[in-house]
């Protein structure tokens, strides 16, 4: 059965050639990204435990995580957290399997703690955080689950929803993405341990000049005073300027912690490396899209991908799929930009979308008619192999934020 794939040429100014471009990335320690990361870690842990016990991923969605900011008194040399960060795990997961209880809350809380321990170095998970699992219950008859899986080897969409992807990234998009990845890389943390994980990067390109505004939480126990703090800021700026020279030939201005007022004793220092310690809250889906960026110059889906089940939830699968299709088209065909939008219809096989729309701005001197069939074939092949995205998610080979 042929798939509903439409390839068309569109006429618009590519983002790289527009006068103004805005790009944002919330780093892994930002409260919104903490919520995303925990939601995804919980979903992955539940999926693996379901497979281990029952041989199949049972229904769940853990895309409702709230991070409620705590209270801290940071000070140079080391402060303290006086009110812990509260993290609420919510959503739904099968807890009763053939009259046997499955330890949803135990698995979820352990996954959340492991994620925090592995992600935010200066966070004492046992003392700085309270994790509360209120994941709703569900029950299932395994025989009916297996029978349904046999009847429908391709999962049926559990929602009418769309996913969006685009490629290639502009220089500004790459720079914003790579800046946060640099500052939160293991190598950089070893060289400059004072830089916390809560790193937010905002990029503005105006013509051929790029402004990068970086908010980087500095860990108070790693700096002895204002002088050392300012030295850390200088090192951040220098590292990002060096990175920028490898990414673009445009002029790049780097600003770090612009709310600081040294004369008034105002510095962005934290005890834990995340602003969640001091009243900054976070929610799933309020931050980066599945490509790791927030891009108001582009089409975007508002779906919260993190924590959604990797089997049939198109809010997760179609956003990743659209990104993969766009990337392959951009890498193999003469396109300036490609936009992919995929729409499901609830109850229908996820490899048979209601529409897969591929909009292309071809490179100068080319027409989409030259490679329309190739673009169609790329999308068709990804849809035919859509279930491999589930495996990529479970193996942690793709990030959704």
Curated annotation (Swiss-Prot):
Its EC number is 2.5.1.6. The keyword Transferase applies. Pathway: Amino-acid biosynthesis; S-adenosyl-L-methionine biosynthesis; S-adenosyl-L-methionine from L-methionine: step 1/1. It comes from the Archaea. ATP binds at residues 136-141. Pfam families: AdoMet_Synthase. Its cofactor is Mg(2+). Belongs to the AdoMet synthase 2 family. Catalyzes the formation of S-adenosylmethionine from methionine and ATP. This is S-adenosylmethionine synthase. It comes from Pyrococcus horikoshii (strain ATCC 700860 / DSM 12428 / JCM 9974 / NBRC 100139 / OT-3).
